[in-house]
Amino acid sequence: QYLFLLFALIVLTGCGGTQKKLTEYVNPFLGTATMWEPEDLGYTRKIKSRTWGAETYPGATLPNAMVQLSPVTQFRSGAGYQYEDTVIYGFSHTAKGHWNLLHVPMLPVVGTIAPGNYCSGFSHEKESAHPGYYQVYLERYKVNAELTSTLRCAYHKYTFGKGDDKSLLVDIRRSNNDVRDWKIEKVDDNTFTGYQDGDGKIYFYAKTNYKIGQVEMVKDDKHEVAVLRFIDSKGVEPLEVKAGFSFVSIENAQMNLKAEMLNKSFAQVAEEADAAWEALLSKIQVAGGTEREKRLFYSTFFHAFKWPALRSDVNHEYTDVRGEVVNNGFHYYTDPSFWDDYRNK
């Protein structure tokens, strides 16, 4: 009798199954498509140009983070990504649903680079996203790109074709704003640093697992880009780039990288990102409703916490509106705009 009761208890316990994680309900692509139809817009379009969408982005980020590591399908656009687009120009490190940011775009490349025409085609069939993680296959260069991030740092992982000559393009002269000033340079065998000054100056300190041969400026009659050439670039290991960012200095960007990411693997950073989102989403537990309604709720919950964005470093320093470096001992964030409160509307 006791054995039967014990067996029944085990069976009933097993029938409960594993509870679905809330991050599994999130669709980071929700809100990335442009609205075209009158029933969505509330009016009939008179011109053929793009109209409004929710202006969300599918890339890797944490709640209210400094870094938003996301694909750019179009510059001078809202969040930089439009679902109906068919090419990717790079993976930028800041984003929101407005026509600015998209700092320091990077793209893995192979072969000779044409600065005016380097973008790669992609398909949604070979693209995926999850809170804190993004993946896409770049058709032109035959590279599988994976991205994850911490609060102030970005982690790029690029798997090239066997025997392909790996390079990294940094479109240092382009963002969603006019770039007034910029700098990029090799510091040592595995480090490059610099800044980009458009609508505010952002600094970066980046480490690569392949030794850097040179940082080459490549120019044509249309544009100029930086290209990192690597020693032993045909190695079998994926190219990995860990980049720390700061709105104060390169030294602070280095400090942020050391504190948050430097000694961690890609898988570890991605797992920690998922855990951070799970902890936030778990603040609200939904009862009832359909699976579709839960996906909508947690996807919009997810998007709502992408902004405002962190602007202070791990030492609490930040650059204020007067351009002065301040340390008040707390986390400093961007001003929230009220119309962005529920960006995924």
Task: Tell where the protein language model's regions lie, with residue ranges.
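Sec-dependent signal peptide recognition
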Residues: 1-6
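Accessory carbohydrate-recognition regions in carbohydrate-active enzymes
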Residues: 18-343
